[in-house]
Amino acid sequence: MAREQLNGASYNWNAFPDRPQLAVALAGRVADRLTRAIAERGTAVLAVSGGTTPTKFFAALSAMPIAWDKVIVTLVDERFVPASSPRSNAGLVAANLLQNAAKAARFVPLYHEASGIEDAAASDDAALRSLPWPLDVVVLGMGPDGHTASFFPDADDLAELLDPASDRIILPVHAASAGEPRLTLTLARIIDAGFIALHIEGEDKRTAFDGAVAPGPRKPIRAVLDAAPRPVEVFWAP
């Protein structure tokens, strides 16, 4: 059921009794959207998030019988660390999503060696313009502070990251709370996606989400809900 919030923000709340059931349901929805995109334009582009939350979802999605050789997988955001780092989202995706049938997908990472994160972001921005836009599916996560992608509340240039009219695809992120510098898709590119899911688990994340959509200071996840032209699909399990 869509739950309309202030300032036009809307979302569909999809609750599940446990995390394995959520993973299977979300994988099915994503697979359906990717299959539809392949039928319509011959390819599909999926952007996923890192962290520990999506591992069961990745495993379920990796076994879905879709034309993975026609799927491009990229990241919503990435730490400025090599894939060999245990904190790398690329490494997480390689180990958990790009397995089974999904081994046939093409993966486009965000991290590469560069003189600095600003140069890496500029290079990524240019390279990603060759992908077929808009994205077909984006799967977001959310931190307890209400951040999503690398839109940290204390990020330098947060207004630029959250500009729905931005023509940038990737921007660098510097935020004290983030640890390493980050690379992230901009809000403008996320909200263009045909299907946007927010995957959260646990009572703490539900509390954080409810706080983000309540009246008061706007958290970054609320910026996505406000700007997206269609309801965001929220998937939650305790």
Curated annotation (Swiss-Prot):
Pathway: Carbohydrate degradation; pentose phosphate pathway; D-ribulose 5-phosphate from D-glucose 6-phosphate (oxidative stage): step 2/3. Hydrolysis of 6-phosphogluconolactone to 6-phosphogluconate. Keywords: Hydrolase. GO terms for biological process: carbohydrate metabolic process; pentose-phosphate shunt. The gene is pgl. Pfam families: Glucosamine_iso (PF01182). It catalyses: 6-phospho-D-glucono-1,5-lactone + H2O = 6-phospho-D-gluconate + H(+). SUPFAM superfamilies: NagB/RpiA/CoA transferase-like. PANTHER family: 6-PHOSPHOGLUCONOLACTONASE. Its EC number is 3.1.1.31. Belongs to the glucosamine/galactosamine-6-phosphate isomerase family. 6-phosphogluconolactonase subfamily. GO terms for molecular function: 6-phosphogluconolactonase activity. It is an enzyme of class 3 (hydrolase). This is 6-phosphogluconolactonase. Signal peptide: none annotated. It comes from the Bacteria. InterPro entries: 6-phosphogluconolactonase_DevB, Glc/Gal-6P_isomerase, NagB/RpiA_transferase-like, PGLS.
